[in-house]
């Protein structure tokens, strides 16, 4: 026996050790003495059995020694009738035993059994034994079921277990004897309440068996209850012997997992772990919720079936379908009133039903009502699910098939038909729920035979991935195998298949797998894909085309500069072509291609041409220009005049901060320093430049000029916008002297914007009082030759010319590189008083353009007004060399009471707001200042349509109001000088240069219209223009013009035609202007 118990192989580990420790004697078997159960030599070592006692429901406060129970029981009084009844009960139990071996009875255990029987039958136990009698289980026999004491004991058991069991429904085969309970009490050391959990397990087992008998009367099964605390068997039914051959007592206290096949233990454990959470949430589950799976349980190897040769016999297993149900033991009440929870005493009720082969005869044909089962496999051919109904037909348990390839079970001769079947499966899978039936094919079963199956196929294609997910075959056995027992092990015989056949079969299997793993395409998908491909191609072509159009020559790709200054951001780009320049990176400013037509003066010129004026060139000789005018004319040709209210795009009224306004002489410059350059170095070069000839402005010439200027404007804009983000203010300032043109510091800005962010709060109308400069002036005489032009012009401070005892060399740069100004209180205090006295136009530097106004109805007959306007051409700039000296001037203003004037065709009028937008800035008179006298140029003809271009003289003794100041009648009545020549006085150290009158008339921006009172009275017959409340003409509202265009427009009486040499020089004048766009650096600004 020791050899059997110590055998290491699993063939003899479980059954033989349990068999060697079992007792055939009913008294010793049922007494469960500690001597027979706890003997170390014959213990099997299995959990909950033999030498490994359980610790379930044991605690220190409930532990009571067994010897005290024996001592109390020995003191009881025994009667012969009670002993006879107990002996009869044990004899009946002995007859039911199945073990042939005999063992000497244990007298102590028999005595204990008798004492317990006496106490239970009396029904009134002693107070000292009441606790023990209440905890023991009663013995129930058929002959004693009607006794009152036993009926009362049954009621107590029902109350303790919360189960309703009627005594008449119990049978002897399912009753639990006292000896079994005491045996478990001894083995598991359940002190204080011996057999309580077993009694509860027994009641649950009896209920389960009764339910099985009620539901499945014809099906044989056994039931067992397992403790989830340690996994031992607490209860099992007697028909266990019929199913597996084990005596019922051999399973008690043994671990259930020892009887499960090794390959099925993982399945059993997984079902337990998944079933426990379901059992714990019983509030939402049915009380008898079951989990069903199949395992192989071990058969018993007894002497009756195999004799005494135990080691050499193989261990056999039988398939069973197990149903799992979880129950929980109720709470127990201790003597002290405390409640002990049995949460750890969760019970597992297993109902085991044997599975038998469904075939009765070899190769039998089954009816359509034959066994049906389903097998599911993936697109890779791996089986993922098998019904439990397939076990009786195939002999495989579900866990035996899951994970294996379905192609391994098909007969090799049927693979061609299987391939056709799967082609149809994939095709039908495109329709959800579509099924089809295939012709029968052979399938391999457990015993190595083949059965013939009729299958209904269905498949599922993922609508998103368009791939086959799984295939389900609903099989029905059409013909059975040659061997009926499907659970027999198949002989390890490999079928003899030729090599070429094997290769062909392998190729067919690969084709089937490839077919199932490929993406499923529908016929309509092909059309959709083609349409989608064409749409994508069209979209790609359109994007490419749009990109090419967007990358045209006029597109400006502006960089995203992160360090733009305030002035750069607020500056007007491209002559203020767009009103959306609030932010430099706005979409409108970066994506709108610049248009030259948006410039204000171009619009006004178009209005001028639309009015269809009668224009003709003057009858005088072709005018000539000196180098200073050439330089200024080139710049003014590109300079847009804007920034007034009502002009297209600016919206700022009166703030003349653009480049063209800088050149409008000293009266409109918004800089704080005076204008003036040191031009002595340029005398030779200036005189040698070819002098362009005035040309008649025509619409064709304007369009040609606009086209050329637009290209230059785009070029300038790209260059100015191509700066990097890390360019600092210092680098910008250093770059400014490279630009040509006067007043380049005053770049093209919006009205109200500042020149630089460093002087954001600097007043716009200030005077620089710190530097009083003695200006070398020019004395002009009519007797000089044309080559002796005046090249020395005086720099001005505060729009004044001064003569002082301080003499400066001609070549010294008298001006700072940038226009800076200082706020001086003197300027503001003397502003009002000296406005009319300390300001006088510098006619020798800034050409004046006189208008002949019509007298008002309320004015006297001899009163008229002559207003002066200064064009944007600055005479201070002589050549590109002198452009390094920024020349600026202080703006002058006139009174608001401007007289209305008649419109004169061909005459360019400045914006009306220029006459009153700026107040004249005073400057204290300096002793010894240059004396200037204005001399009359003679009387004019009565037609008043001819322009006489002369240089305005400097005042001698009296200072007159600004150039835009309205001329009062009192001033007109003053006698004029006898001759029309202009002259100035220079300092003693400066030589006087003279020029003929013909060359002085070459300055196109300078014209003086003077006449007597009779001439002015003749002017009153002219039609009166529409004027506003301020007396301003609305003919050219909201516009100003550059000197380039003002030089074109001349009026005449129409009696003369332009000379031939003027026609010849039209193109020559425009060409040098266009060829030098770089000289006009102030047109587009710095940003």
Curated annotation (Swiss-Prot):
Residues 1-98, 123-153, 613-692, 736-759, 871-893, 956-1087 are annotated as: Disordered. Residues 141-150 have a biased composition (Acidic residues). GO terms for molecular function: transcription cis-regulatory region binding; transcription corepressor binding. Residues 15-46, 79-93, 665-689, 1028-1047 have a biased composition (Low complexity). Residues 65-78 have a biased composition (Basic residues). Gene3D superfamilies: PAS domain, Single helix bin. Residues 220-355, 373-479 form the PAS domain. Keywords: Biological rhythms, Cytoplasm, Nucleus, Phosphoprotein, Repeat. Phosphorylated with a circadian rhythmicity, probably by the double-time protein (dbt). Phosphorylation could be implicated in the stability of per monomer and in the formation of heterodimer per-tim. Coiled coil: none annotated. A motif (Nuclear localization signal) lies at residues 65-78. PANTHER family: PERIOD CIRCADIAN PROTEIN (PTHR11269:SF16). Forms a heterodimer with timeless (TIM); the complex then translocates into the nucleus. This is Period circadian protein. It comes from Drosophila virilis. The lineage of its organism: Eukaryota, Metazoa, Ecdysozoa, Arthropoda, Hexapoda.
